[in-house]
A protein has these predicted regions:
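Short, ordered loop/turn segments at secondary-structure junctions
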Residues: 34-36, 78, 103-107, 137-138, ...
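Active-site-lining helix/loop region of Rossmann-like oxidoreductase modules
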Residues: 7, 151-279, 290-292, 315
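Rossmann-fold NAD(P)-binding glycine/threonine-rich loop
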Residues: 83-87, 95, 103-130
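C-terminal active-site/capping subdomain that shapes the small-molecule cofactor and substrate pocket
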Residues: 236-357
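Alpha-helical support elements that line or immediately flank enzyme active sites
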Residues: 140-153
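Conserved active-site and cofactor/substrate-binding residues in soluble primary-metabolism enzymes
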Residues: 7, 11, 15, 84-87, ...
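General beta-strand structural signal in soluble alpha/beta enzymes
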Residues: 101-102, 132-135, 161-162
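N-terminal glycine-/serine-/threonine-rich beta1-alpha1-beta2 phosphate-ribose binding loop
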Residues: 1-95, 215, 317
Length: 357
C-alpha cells in the first residue's frame, strides 16, 4: 500500500479523501488542514462519510512530511494563493513525495511553463527525489486524454472543441464565484478570471497538450469573452442572493490557431442560474456537463455528466478530477522522479473490487 496524504479538505479535498480511501493500492496516512476548527476531526467526517477512518486531521505540515509519505494529493486551492500553493508543493516534492494536484495551472503543460514555476519544482525533484503531476481542470481529462482519444476514432479531424457547461447554483465557493468569475457583480466589474491573458494562462497549456498529441504546432492562442446580466434576482442555497442586473453568465473560448484557423478550442459556458443566457449551449440534462466535439469525418460528439454527494454535478466533476490524480499515483511511484503532464501519465483502468465510501 502506498502511504498517501490528502492536503486540504475543501470541495476537492473531500473528494480526494474518498478517492484515496477507495483505491486498493493507496492508504490514507494523514490529512492536512489549515482551519484550526478542523484539527483533530476524523477524515471520514471531513469527507462527509458515514465511516470513521481513524485518521485525525492535523495542521503540522513538518511532522506529516517528516513521516515520509510516498504520495500527496494536494487539494488546497491555488486560485487565490498560487505562490503559497507552489511553495507547499515544492516542499512536499522536496521531501521525496509524489505529488498530484490540480492547483498550478501553468504546469498543466509543464514543458512550456514559466521558469519561475518550473525551476523550483525541478530543483525539488533533483534534491528530494519526488515527482509532480498537475491535472484536474475541466476536470483533468476533458481537455486532454478524452479529446485525443476521440480524434483516433475518425478518418479526418478538422476542429477539436472541448466544452464545460455549468450552472453554479449548487457551488459552495462564494469567493471564487463572486470575485474571480464575477457572478452577481456589476457588468462594469472586470472579473480577474476573464482579464486579458488569464484564460490563456489557465487553459492555454491544455491547448498545447492537445496540439502536441496531434503532432501540430499552435501559431497563437486567442481569447473570446462574452458576458450576460441576470434579468431577475435569483437565490442560491449555498451562496445567497444574486441581484438582477449583475453578471449572470459568461461564455469564453480559448482558441488554438493552427493554419490560421481556430482548430483547437476550449469553451466555457457558465451560469449562476439556468434562466440566464438560455440561447447559449446547455447541458442535455441536469446542471452541467463536459462535452467534446470532433468536427471531421465522422463528426463525433461525446457528453459526460458526473454526479456525487447526492446528485451534485460540481461534486461529480471534482470526483473525476481526483480519480484521475489518485489513479496516477501507483504509476508515478514506479517512474523516475520528475515533472509530468497528462500526455506522460497513462490513464489506468478502474477495478471492480474497490470499496465505495
Amino acid at each position: 500500500m502506498i502511504s498517501t496524504v490528502v492536503w486540504g479538505t475543501g470541495n476537492v479535498g473531500r473528494a480526494a479523501i474518498r478517492a484515496v480511501t477507495a483505491h486498493p493500492g493507496l492508504e490514507l496516512s494523514a490529512v492536512l488542514v489549515s482551519n484550526p476548527a478542523k484539527v483533530g476531526r476524523d477524515a471520514g467526517e471531513l469527507a462527509g462519510l458515514d465511516t470513521v477512518l481513524g485518521v485525525a486531521a492535523t495542521d503540522d505540515i513538518a511532522a506529516v512530511l517528516a513521516a515520509g509519505p510516498r504520495a500527496v494529493v494536494y487539494a488546497a486551492s491555488g486560485d487565490i494563493r498560487p505562490d503559497d500553493a507552489l511553495a507547499d508543493i515544492v516542499r512536499a516534492v522536496g521531501a521525496g513525495a509524489v505529488v498530484v494536484t490540480p492547483a498550478l495551472y501553468p504546469l498543466y503543460d509543464q514543458r512550456n511553463a514559466p521558469a519561475e514555476m518550473r525551476e523550483p519544482v525541478l530543483k525539488a525533484v533533483a534534491e528530494g527525489g519526488g515527482s509532480l503531476f498537475v491535472s484536474g481542470i475541466d476536470p483533468g481529462w476533458g481537455n486532454d486524454v478524452l479529446p485525443l482519444l476521440m480524434t483516433g476514432l475518425g478518418s479526418t479531424v478538422d476542429v477539436v472543441r472541448c466544452q464545460e457547461i455549468f450552472d453554479y447554483t449548487t457551488y459552495d465557493q462564494p469567493d471564487s464565484v463572486r470575485w474571480l468569475v464575477g457572478m452577481g457583480q456589476p457588468m462594469d466589474y472586470e472579473p480577474p478570471m476573464l482579464a486579458p491573458g488569464i484564460p490563456t494562462m489557465v487553459w492555454g497549456g491544455q491547448i498545447r497538450l492537445i496540439a502536441r498529441g496531434l503532432g501540430v504546432e499552435v501559431e497563437e492562442i486567442r481569447e473570446v469573452v462574452e458576458r450576460r446580466p441576470l434579468e431577475t434576482t435569483v437565490e442560491t442555497e449555498l451562496m445567497g442572493k444574486f441581484e438582477a442586473g449583475g453578471q449572470g453568465a459568461i461564455r469564453f473560448e480559448v482558441q488554438g490557431i493552427v493554419d490560421g484557423r481556430a482548430r483547437i478550442v476550449i469553451e466555457h459556458v457558465t451560469r449562476i442560474h439556468a434562466s440566464c443566457a438560455t440561447d447559449w449551449p446547455l447541458p442535455h440534462s441536469g446542471a452541467g456537463a463536459h462535452r467534446v466535439i470532433i468536427e471531421g469525418n465522422p463528426r463525433i460528439e461525446v457528453t459526460i455528466q458526473a454526479t456525487a454527494e447526492g446528485g451534485n454535478h460540481s461534486a461529480g466533476g471534482n470526483a473525476t478530477a481526483v480519480g484521475r490524480l489518485a489513479g496516477a499515483i501507483p504509476w508515478l511511484t514506479t517512474a523516475e522522479p520528475g515533472l509530468y503532464d497528462a500526455l506522460d501519465v497513462p490513464l489506468p483502468f478502474g477495478t471492480l473490487d474497490r470499496s465505495h465510501p
